[in-house]
Amino acid sequence: MQLVRGLHNLRPEHRGCVATIGNFDGVHRGHQAILARLRERAVELGVPSCVVIFEPQPREFFTPETAPARLALARQAATAGGEGVDRVLCLAFNQRLRSLSAAEFVDRILVDGLGVQHLEVGDDFHFGCDRVGDFDFLQHAGVNQGFTVEAAQTVELDGLRVSSTQVRNALAAADFDLAERLLGRPFRIAGRVLHGQKLARQLGTPTANVQLKRRRVPLTGVYLVSVDIDGQSWPGVANIGVRPTVAGDGKAHLEVHLLDFAGDLYDRRLTVVFHQKLREEQRFASLEALKTAINADVAAARALAAPSAHR
């Protein structure tokens, strides 16, 4: 899978493709259905498949303080590579891009930039300044510009429309079984381990500080997790939140303690898979009270993880 950042990095060899456009936040089963159809059309036409995404996502640009928590960063839409996509075009969503009319978007990005032969979109897709572009607009543009358009049907699960919002709702309710069914895989967060204050080590429970490059996260609290490291899975306990007892920066942090693990994790990339919520994050009156709570969390995680430890 090739990642292209910005229209200015498109080359002549990138022209001629089938494409889809969207946030693809989390690449849930609805997205997967679109990508599966995209692959089919790519094979039929004998051209590469391309996913067009935006960073930041439009709602983060317009209302950053109230935009929903991201399930994954745009660069992690490289998950699409696991869905058989040949190329991801990541466009910076800025004032210039948001000002493009629907017609300009089609001309500059789809036709001049990508040379689109076929476009696959969701049934509720809108684009262009003030979101005036829709499926009907694309169909008319396709007739004039020489590309076809198809709208993917809504994917439902037990009568529920599969969407990123529904995934976030499931995560907020700590319903990881439902989240997994909506996503088609367990919910996970991947990131690199950074050096921290080493306070947890002083409290007797060393943790890996996993980098979170996002304003908001869809989870908060203490969780039973498993951590994938070089193909091996380790059970653990994770805290995700603002660390109210020891930090005052208001930023989200992900700290993971691996059960019975001995080794250096700094600068390594971990994938944290969430299984069960143990408790809410809370502010403690003292570090000693925090230590007691952490020990209880570890004991609870150990008891729950015992049947499947160290897979």
From Swiss-Prot:
Pathway: Cofactor biosynthesis; FAD biosynthesis; FAD from FMN: step 1/1; Cofactor biosynthesis; FMN biosynthesis; FMN from riboflavin (ATP route): step 1/1. It holds the Pfam family Flavokinase. It comes from the Bacteria. Keywords: ATP-binding, FAD, Flavoprotein, FMN, Kinase, Multifunctional enzyme, Nucleotide-binding, Nucleotidyltransferase, Transferase. Gene3D superfamilies: HUPs, Riboflavin kinase-like. InterPro entries: FAD_synthase, Riboflavin_kinase, Riboflavin_kinase_bac, Riboflavin_kinase_bac/euk, Riboflavin_kinase_dom_sf, Rossmann-like_a/b/a_fold. One of its GO terms (biological process) is FAD biosynthetic process. It catalyses: riboflavin + ATP = FMN + ADP + H(+); FMN + ATP + H(+) = FAD + diphosphate. CDD domains: FAD_synthetase_N. Disulfide bonds: none annotated. Coiled coil: none annotated. Its EC number is 2.7.1.26, 2.7.7.2. One of its GO terms (molecular function) is riboflavin kinase activity. Catalyzes the phosphorylation of riboflavin to FMN followed by the adenylation of FMN to FAD. Belongs to the RibF family. This is Bifunctional riboflavin kinase/FMN adenylyltransferase. It comes from Pseudomonas fluorescens. The gene is ribF.
